[in-house]
């Protein structure tokens, strides 16, 4: 893979690691279809049903089947724990035949590493990672440059829930992310998939040019207990994308295991270049 130059402009005292993909990058573009289909992109933002390894093994086949049925082009997985090299998000990627990038600030020598994951079934040409300030457990943000038909699209993944979750800290992290996007997007259409503790009004104000895909942010966005703010969502650049639809990602009940809301999936259409420059 070819990391972006800005991914390397970090303080030398920080150990930001991007895991080796679980699979080789997909080499073939999506199956040919109508032109409108090639310009559509489906992006899921979710959390796994449990970060406990034993409980995860109880439900991972069910989650795998759910994502196999949904077939999102890109999956952002929040709050992933990698234990002794075992990564649940990359396990899913290996079964789905997606690539998997684990974005973390923890060094490889750490037994348990905290981060977020980016899964894609589209070809990935570049990726990068940066650290949002103030630093925290999940404050590493990542990006992938994907090939969608004849177009390149940037997908940024971040968890904007600083520790402590205060307005000044949220503003600082969001400002860091937007500055990084401005430095690395190279004018290409861009999305942000992640988890946001800011209110919807604050989120829209702090990410100019982007719009949340979720029409009803008051609804619970994930299974995580007590999460506040806007929650899991996909933000898209209004000058480059149009929202087609969004849907909740629901894990059905399975015997004694309850049904869970894992996140959301947005279906977006890439606008014509001529239309976006008028």
What are these regions (language model features)?
Residues 50-55, 133, 166-170:
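Short, flexible loop segments at the rims of nucleotide/cofactor-binding pockets, characterized by
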Residues 2, 8, 14, 23-94, ...:
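N-terminal, active-site-proximal structural segment of metallo-dependent hydrolase catalytic domains
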Residues 42-48, 63-86, 119, 144, ...:
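Active-site beta-strand/loop signature of hydrolases that rely on acidic residues for catalysis
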Residues 38-52, 128, 152-162:
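Active-site-proximal beta-strand elements of phosphoester/diester hydrolases
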Residues 53, 82-86, 109-111, 163-165, ...:
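Active-site environment of divalent metal-dependent phosphoester hydrolases
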Residues 19-21:
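N-terminal signal peptide c-region/cleavage motif recognized by signal peptidases
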Residues 16, 25-33, 182-191, 197-278:
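Metal-dependent phosphoester-hydrolase catalytic domains
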Residues 56, 79-160, 247-251:
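Structured beta-strand-rich core segments of catalytic domains in phosphoester-bond hydrolases
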């Amino acid at each position: 893979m070819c990391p972006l130059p800005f991914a390397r402009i970090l303080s030398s005292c920080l150990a930001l690691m991007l895991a080796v993909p679980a699979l080789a990058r997909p080499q073939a573009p999506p199956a040919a279809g109508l032109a409108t289909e090639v310009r559509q992109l489906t992006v899921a933002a979710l959390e796994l049903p449990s970060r406990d390894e034993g409980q995860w093994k109880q439900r991972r086949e069910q989650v795998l089947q759910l994502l196999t049925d949904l077939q999102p082009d890109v999956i952002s997985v929040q709050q992933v724990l990698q234990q002794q090299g075992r990564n649940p998000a990359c396990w899913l990627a290996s079964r789905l035949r997606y690539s998997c990038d684990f974005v973390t600030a923890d060094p490889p020598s750490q037994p348990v590493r905290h981060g977020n994951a980016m899964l894609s079934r589209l070809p990935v040409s570049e990726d990068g990672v940066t650290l949002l300030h103030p630093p925290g457990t999940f404050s590493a943000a990542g990006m992938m440059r994907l090939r969608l038909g004849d177009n390149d699209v940037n997908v940024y993944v971040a968890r904007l829930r600083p520790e402590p979750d205060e307005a000044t800290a949220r503003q600082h992290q969001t400002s860091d992310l937007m500055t990084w996007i401005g430095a690395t997007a190279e004018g290409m259409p861009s999305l942000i998939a992640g988890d946001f503790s800011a209110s919807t009004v604050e989120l829209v104000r702090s990410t100019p040019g982007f719009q949340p895909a979720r029409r009803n942010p008051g609804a619970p966005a994930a299974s995580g207990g007590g999460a506040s703010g806007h929650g899991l969502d996909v933000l898209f650049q209004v000058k480059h994308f149009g929202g087609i639809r969004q849907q909740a990602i629901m894990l059905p009940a399975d015997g004694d295991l309850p049904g869970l809301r894992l996140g959301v999936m947005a279906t977006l259409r890439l606008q014509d270049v001529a239309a976006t420059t008028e």
